[in-house]
């Protein structure tokens, strides 16, 4: 067919491709709207195209159609397949069921795997969405408060003693140094006898 218009023909639809809508690949021209995978119709670009003869594919479809065949091939990385290869005579042994540990002093890792951590204040399970870590333990956001005054705490504003958490003020009053000049705040002197 003669090319009277002088423009290049699209490798898919065979219509004239003008410069503003042209995509070039392997010496052929395509309309941007025609530069699609022949199988799945995904848009392609220079990093995702694979060419076979005059046909263009995304890399995934190209691999499925023209890549190596057989057990373990053609799916690509990260793809889960339920084919166990039984048609090829491959036999699989059943794995024994999971048995929980009977060790009363299981490691912290084993305790975490076995179930969720427990909040030291309310003893309920602590899930990721409500977890705050302080004093080396996981707490609910609502339970992460001073044991004396109930003030909300942050991991940088707490002090801990005997597994309980306190604000700095309550900790200083209850567990800080005692005696002349201590425990009343700045500028106050108290004589304790």
From Swiss-Prot:
Pfam families: LIM. Gene3D superfamilies: Cysteine Rich Protein (2.10.110.10). There is a cross-link at residue 91 (Glycyl lysine isopeptide (Lys-Gly) (interchain with G-Cter in SUMO2)). Keywords: Acetylation, Isopeptide bond, LIM domain, Metal-binding, Nucleus, Phosphoprotein, Repeat, Ubl conjugation, Zinc. SUPFAM superfamilies: Glucocorticoid receptor-like (DNA-binding domain). Residues 10-61, 119-170 form the LIM zinc-binding domain. The modification N6-acetyllysine is found at residues 84, 112, 131, 137, 161. The keyword Zinc applies. A motif (Nuclear localization signal) lies at residues 64-69. One of its GO terms (cellular component) is focal adhesion. The modification Phosphoserine is found at residues 81, 192. It is found in: Nucleus. Its main location: nucleus. One of its GO terms (biological process) is muscle tissue development. One of its GO terms (molecular function) is zinc ion binding. Could play a role in neuronal development. Interacts with ASCC1; ASCC2 and TRIP4. This is Cysteine and glycine-rich protein 1. It comes from Homo sapiens. The gene is CSRP1.
């Amino acid at each position: 067919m003669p090319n009277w218009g002088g423009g290049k023909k699209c490798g898919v639809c065979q219509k004239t491709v003008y410069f503003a809508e042209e995509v070039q690949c392997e010496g052929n021209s395509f309309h941007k709207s025609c530069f699609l995978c022949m199988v799945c119709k995904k848009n392609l670009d220079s990093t995702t195209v694979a060419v076979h003869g005059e046909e263009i594919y995304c890399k995934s479809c190209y691999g499925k159609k023209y890549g190596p065949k057989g057990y373990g091939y053609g799916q690509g990385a990260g793809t889960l397949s339920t084919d166990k290869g039984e048609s090829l005579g491959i036999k699989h042994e059943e794995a024994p069921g999971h048995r929980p540990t009977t060790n009363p002093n299981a490691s912290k890792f084993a305790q975490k795997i076995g179930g969720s951590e427990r909040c030291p204040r309310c003893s309920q399970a602590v899930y990721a969405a409500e977890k705050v870590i302080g004093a080396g333990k996981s707490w609910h956001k609502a339970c992460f408060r001073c044991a004396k005054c109930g003030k909300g705490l942050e991991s940088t504003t707490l002090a801990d003693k005997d597994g309980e958490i306190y604000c700095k003020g309550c900790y200083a009053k209850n567990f800080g140094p005692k005696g002349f000049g201590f425990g009343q705040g700045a500028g106050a002197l108290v004589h304790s006898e």
